[in-house]
Amino acid sequence: ATEVNKSTYGRLTQWGAKCLMARMYLNAGVYTGTPMWNECLEQCNDIINSGLFSLETNYTDIFKTENSGCVETIFAIPYDEVYNEGDNNGPVFGAHMKFLSSNSRKVFNMQTTPWGGSAANPQFINSYDPDDMRLKYTWLQGDQYSPDGVLITTFPNKLPSIYKTDTDDGYRVGKYEIKVGAKSLLSNDFPYFRYTEVLLMKAECLLPLRTKRNRSSHIVSQIRERAFRESAHPEKATVDAAWLKGDTHINYGTLDEKGQIDDAGNTEVVELGGLYDEWGWEFAAEARRRTDMIRFG
């Protein structure tokens, strides 16, 4: 189907298939040894030229509880906290149970207790520009209050070794809206393919093809405009080709018990490190990071 409406929502349309093909072409160089930038670019341009999708004005609207009308979504996996409840064989979405600590139950007045299994790597958190609003909108950080204003717990930006980590250490994913009174499942539909990905794939294709590199930086700046619009420095959204081609902002390495890097590991420059970082900041907690890490080496 080529239509984008209620009848095709949650189904893989022609545009979803093209986005999937673009993903495969994007990583073809590391999968097969033969880059397929032109093939990826063709699929991206088909989606862009369809005129059926656009960037959502507000980043948070992509991930809110009632997000089925998101103009950015190309393919979403529909979830429902009521109709899918108790059906372990059906599609269920309970990301908050994995990411939140047990103390978060009081923060959101939840009807169940989260498992508290995952937290953000401080090195990744520290790579964000402080004015990038995606840092605020993606991660629960600092003091956490109950609906009536009582301080429940604090999520510090630290994650020392497994032997020294407390249950509330590290920022937690707050990207997907959690309603007060949440159960073990959420009704947020998961945006498996979204228009921003298509734009970033196009930007990445243009760089190695050595054509229209200014166009590539313009596309990335367009995406970043949404992330910096509400900040004190919206001009930071604008980047150039040199920024995209520069090294990553992430300080990789292992952490000691005090949360300090004690082994820097591989310190080689990441080619297109700025673009690599942009993939991470835009799509954190959207189940695609490993694919990008493979592509960037």
Predicted regions, residues:
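Acidic/polar-rich alpha-helix caps and helix-coil junctions
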Residues: 1-89, 130-297
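Short, cationic low-complexity segments
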Residues: 93-116
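A contiguous, surface-exposed recognition patch within enzymatic or periplasmic domains that forms
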Residues: 106, 113, 121-129, 133
